[in-house]
UniProtKB/Swiss-Prot annotation:
Family listed: In the N-terminal section; belongs to the site-specific recombinase resolvase family.
Gene: yokA
Full protein name: Resolvase homolog YokA
Active-site residue list: 22 (o-(5'-phospho-dna)-serine intermediate)
Residues of the DNA-binding region: 173-303
Length: 545
């Protein structure tokens, strides 16, 4: 009996097709460059189209070991549990699971409880048939055993190669290339010189000035040296990663971290790590590397220098009232005709909403309006100042009413932190298994670090919100305002001025009330929102004295 007739003999109205690469598929892709997932999709489309029952294909791009590591399959199980499909189609039964026996048990229980038919290109399995059920259990069991044996062989080989100083961590790091005969790293002369330059600038600076990671990145970009991934612009994360990588002193490390049962990543005991010194030719001498690590450990933020991009005074401070987008500085060059017929060039600075173009106001006017606002607070009497701040705090609570309660906000942030830690574990797994290159890992890690930073800022704001019942000390507010304004006028660095404004202001909402008309500039209103710590903390501005 052909496949179509067998399937149609069951009461099936919808079929779910699940596509996933096997380990053999991955190895074939590496050898031949073929796209096995597309090949699998074409096969299943051909099989299921011939059956003439509505179906949907879901494709797992990754290949996780457990159900939790396969988000698409996890979603499939939920759909099957809810009865959206009466059958699941796979290239072979082993595509369903190679995870733990508990995973296999979960799948078997679902197949039996929902009486789900399994469709493969060659056979249909009915969980109500004892013979079919025995075959399903056997194949899932053998898939796990085969996976364990393969992993043991691969792990054993990796340990052996690593102990011999061979490179087994994916792509060769910047400055080296993999010697296919020895499986060890050989220096690439041009890239090695760049690595040496990075260490030299970090330790000794340039032209008598100390250089931060960002300044070094800007310097390499200005020299038009391609990044490890071939891009034009270097970033601070790549610089720091190079400075901390022991591979440049000839050391190879393997199995440094491990994942605990609760999902956290910890450093393995030293006796369990594989560390091979002098595994390949070093690019940096050990003394220079050690000096760099000491400097990194004791590093303090550096002031910007001429090679380093400097933030403007209002960077990240102002928001458009109409669309909620951040406002950015825009500087244009204009030509003015003089009465004597000559021309003169002048520059115009504006603050604009680049995305939606709904706000366009003079930059200096907004800066002055913010400073005037801060000065005006100092002129208010105690009662009016307290009333103004309480009104602002109430508005902040209203703006965050979608969270409804502080408890819900706290729970939301805790859940977000858990999600970020899971992401962190994921990218470390991919990096250590060689799936992520150094550049891709650094890019993902940098993005994740930014999310962690935003999360911490949100926690700080929530803590401030929870403390708003504290009595507002008008003297504290005035003292902090005076320090900020005085220091602002002293500073010549726009970036330091930006730090001062961001210390006191959580946001400044700019509302353009009238567009520019000829020589008459655009009219606007500002709604500043003070930071909680600035209002209540006596030491908020101490770092500037």
């Amino acid at each position: 009996m052909e496949l179509k007739n067998i399937v149609n003999s069951y009461n099936i109205t919808n079929i779910l097709g699940y596509l996933r690469r096997s380990r053999q598929d991955m190895e074939r892709e590496k050898r031949t460059g073929e796209d096995t997932l597309t090949e699998q999709k074409e096969l299943m489309n051909k099989i299921l189209t011939a059956i003439e029952i509505p179906y949907e294909l879901k494709m797992e791009i990754g290949s996780g070991e457990s159900i939790d590591g396969r988000p698409v399959f996890k979603e499939c199980l939920k759909d099957l549990e809810e009865g959206k499909y009466q059958a699941i189609a796979v290239k072979e039964i082993t595509r369903l699971s190679r995870g733990s026996y508990s995973d296999a048990g979960q799948i078997v229980n679902l197949l039996q409880s929902k009486r789900l038919i399994i469709i493969t290109p060659y056979k249909v399995y009915d969980p109500r048939n004892p013979v079919d059920m025995r075959q399903i259990r056997f194949e899932l069991f053998m898939a796990r055993e085969e996976f364990e044996m393969t992993r043991e062989r691969m792990t054993g080989a990796k340990y052996t190669y690593a102990a011999q100083g061979k490179w087994i961590s994916g792509l060769a790091p910047y400055g080296y290339q993999l010697n296919k005969k020895t499986s060890k790293l050989d220096p690439v002369e041009d890239e090695a010189k760049v690595v040496q330059l990075i260490f030299n600038i970090f330790l000794n600076g340039l032209n008598g000035k100390d250089y931060s990671y960002t300044a070094i990145a800007s310097h390499l970009t200005n020299l038009q040296i391609p990044t490890p991934s071939g891009k034009k612009r270097w970033n601070q994360y790549t610089i720091k990663a190079i400075l901390q990588n022991e591979v440049y002193i000839g050391t190879v490390k393997y199995k440094v971290r491990e994942k605990t049962k609760d999902g956290k990543r910890t450093i393995r005991p030293e006796k369990e790590q594989i560390v091979v010194q002098d595994a390949h030719a070093p690019i940096i001498d050990k003394e220079q590397f050690q000096q760099s690590q000491v400097k990194i450990a004791n590093k303090v933020p550096l002031l910007p220098n001429k090679d380093e991009f400097e933030l403007s005074e209002l960077a990240g401070v102002c928001t458009c009232s109409k669309c909620g987008e951040p406002l950015s500085k825009y500087e244009s060059k204009r030509i003015r005709k003089n009465k004597d017929g000559t021309e003169s060039v002048y520059h115009v600075k504006s603050l604009t909403c680049k995305k939606n173009k709904c706000t366009y106001v003079r930059y200096n006017d907004v800066e002055n309006a913010i400073l005037d606002y801060l000065s005006s607070l100092n002129d208010l009497n105690d009662s009016t100042l307290t009333k103004h701040i309480n009104s602002m705090l109430s508005k902040y609570e209203d703006d965050n009413s979608n969270m409804k309660t502080k408890k819900q906000m706290s729970e939301h942030l805790s859940q977000k932190e858990k999600e970020l830690k899971n992401k962190e574990n994921f990218i470390f797994d991919k990096y250590e298994s060689g799936i992520y290159s150094d550049e891709l890992f650094l890019k993902r890690k940098a993005a994740l670090d930014e999310e962690f930073k935003e999360l911490q800022n949100a926690k700080n704001e929530l803590n401030g919100l929870q403390d708003t019942q504290s009595e507002i000390d008008s003297n504290t507010v005035r003292n902090n305002i005076n320090k900020i304004i005085d220091q602002y006028h002293i500073e010549s660095s726009s970036e330091k001025k930006n730090e001062l404004l961001r210390m006191v202001l959580k946001d400044v909402i700019v509302n353009m009330t009238q567009k520019r008309k000829g020589p008459i500039p655009a009219q606007f209103e500002i709604t500043p929102i003070l930071r909680f710590n600035f209002i209540f903390d006596l030491t908020a501005t101490n770092s500037f004295h």
